[in-house]
Amino acid sequence: MKLLIQRVSAARVEVEGEVVGGIDQGLLALVGIEPQDDQASLTRALHKLLNYRVFSDEAGKMNRSLTDVQGGLLLVSQFTLAADTKSGMRPSFSSAAPPAQGEALFDALVEAARARHPQVATGRFGANMQVHLVNDGPVTFLLEV
């Protein structure tokens, strides 16, 4: 599972002009699910999302987690993160999970996140989405679990 996380001061997802999910301060996580991902991957991913220290403390050091700052978490499924880009001039998506598996694991991630964190929003799986964000920093990390 690949997670592209961005520290944001605000973010929202629109589908066909309608806002389907949004947060204020927090993390936007683009989630790429791969065929080998399972419940253990999901558990590790959620632990990282909630506890990875990317928010500044009083000294300006990245020492606070999403849980510490009680920020929002916006989860957006993005199968293109799992693309194979090593050869040629066109990405291959054979390394991404099949849609049914991807949707099941993404839904399970959302459900687990909502059980452990008070502010969770999402995009819409499989939809053509417009993601709007204000990257704070900018701070962006690619996590692989």
UniProtKB/Swiss-Prot annotation:
Pfam families, A to Z: Tyr_Deacylase
GO cellular component, one term: cytoplasm
Main localisation: cytoplasm
Alphabetically ordered keywords of this record: Cytoplasm, Hydrolase, RNA-binding, tRNA-binding
Localization: Cytoplasm
Catalytic activity reported: glycyl-tRNA(Ala) + H2O = tRNA(Ala) + glycine + H(+); a D-aminoacyl-tRNA + H2O = a tRNA + a D-alpha-amino acid + H(+)
EC number(s) recorded for this UniProt protein: 3.1.1.96
Keyword Phosphoprotein recorded: no
Motif Gly-cisPro motif, important for rejection of L-amino acids in this chain: 137-138
GO biological process: D-amino acid catabolic process
Intrachain S-S bonds: none
Signal sequence, renumbered to the chain: none
GO molecular function, one term: Gly-tRNA(Ala) deacylase activity
Family to which the UniProt record says this protein belongs: Belongs to the DTD family.
Function description: An aminoacyl-tRNA editing enzyme that deacylates mischarged D-aminoacyl-tRNAs. Also deacylates mischarged glycyl-tRNA(Ala), protecting cells against glycine mischarging by AlaRS. Acts via tRNA-based rather than protein-based catalysis; rejects L-amino acids rather than detecting D-amino acids in the active site. By recycling D-aminoacyl-tRNA to D-amino acids and free tRNA molecules, this enzyme counteracts the toxicity associated with the formation of D-aminoacyl-tRNA entities in vivo and helps enforce protein L-homochirality.
Domain commentary: A Gly-cisPro motif from one monomer fits into the active site of the other monomer to allow specific chiral rejection of L-amino acids.
Subunit field text: Homodimer.
Designated name of the protein: D-aminoacyl-tRNA deacylase
